[in-house]
Amino acid sequence: MEAIIEVESNGNKHAKNGNQIGVMQITPILVADCNEILKQRKSAKRFKLSDRFSVAKSKEMFLLIQSWYNPHNNVEKAIRLWNGGVNYKIKSTQRYYEKVMRAMK
């Protein structure tokens, strides 16, 4: 997760690129996806768009997405999923995957 943060924003919680915000460059669609997962799990908790500026809440959203779509904690899948979404393509996430792997070393 720290390598993804480094690649996404270099640790800047105020980073903004279009509708991607925070250390993990979270989009409004991802916040909505997290809230849908919480709803399916019958949790009363919900994330707000402003939570993207919080490092802790951004990490929570990352872990929630991974627990739902990557329950076996496959590192490669985690990286590609974060970059390309649920229906990621290997080819279109390859450069990002390599960048994160370099940041992990």
Question: What do these predicted ranges mean?
Answer:
Residues M1-K105:
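Catalytic glycan-binding domains that act on GlcNAc-containing polysaccharides
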